[in-house]
UniProtKB/Swiss-Prot annotation:
EC number of this enzyme: 6.3.4.2
Catalytic residues of the enzyme: C382, H509, E511
SUPFAM superfamilies from the UniProt entry: Class I glutamine amidotransferase-like, P-loop containing nucleoside triphosphate hydrolases
Record has Thylakoid as a keyword: no
Residues that hold ATP according to the record: S15, I16, G17, K18, G19, I20, D72
Name of the gene encoding the protein in the UniProt record: pyrG
Name assigned to this protein: CTP synthase
Domain of life: Bacteria
Length: 535
């Protein structure tokens, strides 16, 4: 069977939910027995989002093979339950960088290097490579931004060319748009969608399906009008209504026959999607009996997308505890020794997630100290683990001024120091310790118990600094347990204080591996402890 290509574009406004639509379709096709992969095209000039501010971009999602990618890849992985790779996120910067390197090496044999064909060919190669490396039946490609953005033009041209390259039966174009509802007039407006489709057709792409994002049901009359003016079948105008829970969306799209229309267009002979388990999960999510309060102490809390995988992992772990996770967003910059008890007193559990830079670190340290001294279940992640070690050094070991060499290079007690293989690296982008690495677990520890007594667990990392082993014996003598280390025993991966209900911190990012139907184990152990603490 030829590989099938589905392209998802957006119009009218950005952040309309293209990624969720693409991920939901991926889940439906996977449940039809098809092998699916998915990728995101981002038209910005950055090579990747690794050096972008979380306020600009939100979370950086890391793949198994160490690619720093768009947060939509997190949605893709959680919905479809697949592990993506470096070909799943492509940016303008990455494409131009590769094309220019080829030009410098003389690979274009003296030709004038142009957007067409060189940039568009490179984009098409990325699409095909993503399908080839995963041996997929179907690849879904989402293009970031909206039709009409100048940055998107080479991407859309590449998508247009794909139809001629692989055949019309192997390509489908899905266009997502906003259908605004004017309360004063009491009507929906189709004109923005019509203009968006007109713009897309002007670029040579005729959409085969429209997905309309709307707050209110559109009604068949609106669908027929859009079908007529946009030249799509009435049944191929699909509603994406606002929902209480994201995981309802695949079921809503299936109820409208979206996946069947896609299969018919692409001539895919696949059985109906069995969504029984997914539906049961959604029913459970909608009817959770308990509630648990988790305080998230972070420096980017003004933009909650900066912690989207953390939030989803907490929710997933709540599901298996029959508990709705209520998150109290605590700005680390506001936390002091004087107000920490007031800010965190009602927390059933405290999580201190990752981050970079000095701002907010002292507030996080105060939150960690509060959790340790008051025996509140606490999970530290990445920088959260490093600050857990610093807090212990200062307030238990008495090492006044203990810090990280990253945050205070002049510190007398560099509890956290730069990794040896990072010392001579000057570039910031793409140079961290990235991707999947193993951690050897200490038998009898809370970490080992969380992972069902596995000897080794593999999780994704994103860091440049590590625990300074010169202090390891001093920590252990005071009851601090290093419950996870690299197989060569050189890098500290997990730390804990066994006397507390749950006081565990890890260098890696467990949230990146969590799924709604398969929550990450360390997060589950943490949320379980928080639920028990709430009783």
């Amino acid at each position: 069977m030829s590989t099938k290509y589905i392209f998802v574009t957006g119009g009218v406004v950005s952040s309309i939910g293209k990624g969720i639509v693409a991920a939901s379709l991926g889940r439906l096709l996977k449940n039809r027995g098809l092998k699916v992969t998915i990728q995101k095209f981002d038209p910005y000039i950055n090579i990747d989002p690794g050096t972008m501010s979380p306020y600009q971009h939100g979370e950086v999602f890391v793949t198994d093979d160490g690619a720093e990618t768009d947060l939509d890849l997190g949605h893709y992985e959680r919905f479809i339950d697949i592990n993506l790779n470096k070909y799943s996120n492509v940016t303008t910067g990455k494409i131009y960088s590769e094309v220019l390197r080829k030009e410098r090496r003389g690979e274009y044999l003296g030709a004038t290097v142009q957007v067409i064909p060189h940039i568009t060919d490179a984009l098409k190669e990325k699409i095909k490579r993503a399908a080839l490396t995963t041996d997929s039946d179907v690849i879904i490609t989402e293009v970031g931004g909206t039709v009409g953005d100048i940055e998107s033009l080479p991407f859309l041209e590449a998508l247009r060319q794909m139809k001629a390259d692989v055949g019309a039966d192997n390509v489908m174009y899905i266009h997502t748009t906003l259908l605004p509802y004017l309360k004063a007039a009491g009507e929906m407006k189709t004109k923005p969608t019509q203009h968006s489709v007109k713009e897309l057709r002007g670029l040579g792409i005729q959409p085969n399906m429209l997905v309309i994002r709307t707050e209110e049901p559109a009604g068949q009359g609106i669908k027929n009008k859009l079908a007529q003016f946009c030249d799509v079948a009435p049944e191929a105008v699909i509603e994406s209504l606002d929902v209480e829970h994201l995981y309802q969306i695949p079921l809503n799209l299936q109820a409208q026959g979206m996946d069947q229309i896609v299969c018919d267009h692409l001539k895919l002979d696949a059985p109906a999607a069995d969504m029984t388990e997914w539906s049961a999960m959604v029913d459970k999510v909608m009817n959770l009996k308990k509630q648990v309060k988790i305080s998230l102490v972070g420096k980017y809390v003004e933009l909650q997308d900066a912690y989207i995988s953390v939030v989803e992992a907490l929710k997933h772990s709540g599901y298996v505890n029959d508990a709705e996770v209520k998150i109290n967003w605590v700005n680390a910059n506001d936390v002091t020794a004087e107000n920490v008890a007031e800010l965190l007193s009602d927390a059933d559990g405290i999580i201190v997630p990752g981050g970079f830079g000095q701002r907010g670190t002292e507030g996080k340290i105060q939150a960690i100290r509060y959790a340790r001294e008051n025996d509140v279940p606490m999970l530290g992640v990445c920088l959260g683990m490093q600050l857990t070690c610093i807090e212990f050094a200062r307030h238990v070991l008495g090492l006044e001024g203990a810090n990280s060499a990253e945050l205070a290079p002049e510190t007398k007690y560099p509890i956290i120091d730069i990794m040896r293989d990072q010392i001579d690296i000057e570039d910031m982008g793409g140079t961290l310790r990235l991707g999947l690495y193993p951690s050897k677990l200490k038998r009898g520890s809370k970490a080992a118990a969380a992972y069902h007594n596995q000897e080794v667990v593999q999780r994704r990392h994103r860091h440049r600094y590590e625990f300074n082993n010169a202090f390891r014996e001093q920590f252990e003598a005071a009851g601090f347990v290093f419950s996870g280390v690299s197989p060569d025993n050189r890098l500290v991966e997990i730390v804990e204080i066994p006397e507390n209900k749950f006081f565990v911190a890890c260098q890696y990012h467990p949230e990146l591996s969590s799924r709604p139907n398969r929550p990450e184990e360390l997060y589950t152990a943490f949320v379980t402890a928080a639920v028990e603490n709430s009783n």
